[in-house]
């Protein structure tokens, strides 16, 4: 566990991804919490000059609140390791593997972690006939950006066009009807399971970041045995991806209480509508307490 006494903490946020605004919101919330905790801190908007900023500010520990690239793909983690600056959250491997939904699927399958059937579609390449309904996702976007649920060929063509506007590889997976849930892990220990009830069709960008657009039920309305199984799956994902500090595993539970892992989030949001702080709060951890626990895991 890192000694934080007299350390200056740089909160890294912003970046250049499609999730920039969410990252700035997370960063500001964490920055304010660190100030309340009594530590020296500075908010750093990440750009190509971030290394110079870290040196200029004499940062001892980096608290990463970047969503998307370069914070969730291992880029910033690799740079910080080269610079010898301890940082919060997952390392290079878990970050780079989890941001790519296709690589994640392959790891899930090799580790026998339950996940929905899937296929890859690449731009300008032929693909197999699709059985509807399916979920279409860009391979490495977060915050539900570019995701569509489709029931027929016409909707599929529109969804593929949208997903390809973000990148050249997309993931198409079987749509599983059920309860949307998420399970967080904090420093190797499971948090209470959250049931997500969005106002819209599914937990999209608007539902995630607009107050009142989704309800978080803690714990999820599932049998205790199922909740325990969900937590164990989350811990297995945490271990298989060699996570550190925090992660959040999104899943679907169908009508038979079968569980399917959707994806791993190595940098859970820290905004007022975010799931991870809600789960921590339900077990008695204030936002400041949560930030301190995450800081202690920096390495």
Q: Language-model features: where?
A:
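Peripheral (often C-terminal) accessory segments that flank ATP-dependent C-N-forming ligase machineries
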Residues: 253-255, 293-299
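Glycine-rich phosphate/pyrophosphate-binding beta-alpha loops
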Residues: 144, 199, 265-279
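Active-site nucleotide/adenylate-binding loops and adjacent lid/helix of ATP-dependent enzymes
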Residues: 2-13, 56, 97-179
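Conserved metal-phosphate-binding beta-hairpin within the catalytic cores
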Residues: 174, 183, 238-270, 280
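ATP-binding N-terminal substructure of ATP-dependent carboxylate-amine bond-forming enzymes
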Residues: 1-93, 97-99, 103, 110, ...
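Phosphate-binding site of ATP-dependent enzymes
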Residues: 11, 151-232, 253-260
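Hydrophobic beta-strand scaffold residues
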Residues: 41, 86-87, 115, 134, ...
């Amino acid at each position: 566990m890192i000694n934080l006494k007299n350390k200056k903490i740089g909160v890294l946020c912003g970046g250049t991804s499609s999730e920039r605004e969410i990252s700035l919101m997370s960063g500001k919330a964490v920055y304010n919490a660190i100030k309340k905790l009594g530590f020296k801190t500075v908010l750093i908007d990440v750009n190509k000059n971030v290394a110079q900023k870290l040196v200029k500010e004499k940062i001892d520990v980096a608290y990463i609140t970047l969503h998307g690239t370069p914070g969730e793909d291992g880029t910033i983690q690799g740079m910080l390791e080269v610079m010898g600056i301890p940082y919060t959250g997952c390392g290079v491997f878990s970050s780079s593997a989890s941001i790519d939904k296709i690589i994640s699927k392959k790891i899930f399958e090799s580790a026998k972690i339950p996940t929905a059937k899937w296929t890859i579609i690449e731009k300008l390449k032929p693909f197999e006939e699709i059985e509807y309904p399916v979920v279409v996702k860009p391979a490495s976007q977060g915050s539900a950006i570019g995701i569509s649920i489709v029931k027929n060929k016409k909707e599929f063509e529109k969804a593929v066009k949208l997903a390809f506007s973000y990148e050249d590889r997309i993931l198409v997976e079987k749509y599983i009807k059920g309860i949307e849930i998420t399970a967080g892990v904090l420093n190797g220990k499971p948090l209470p399971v959250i049931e997500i009830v969005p106002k819209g069709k599914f937990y999209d960008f608007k539902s995630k970041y607009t107050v009142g657009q989704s309800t978080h039920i803690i714990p999820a309305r599932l049998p205790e045995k199922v909740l325990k199984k969900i937590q164990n799956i989350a811990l297995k994902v945490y271990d298989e991806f060699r996570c550190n500090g925090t992660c959040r595993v999104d899943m679907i539970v169908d009508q038979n209480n079968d569980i399917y892992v959707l994806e791993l989030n190595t940098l859970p949001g820290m905004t007022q509508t975010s799931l991870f702080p809600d789960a921590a709060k339900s077990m008695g951890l204030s936002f400041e307490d949560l930030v301190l626990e995450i800081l202690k895991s920096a390495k």
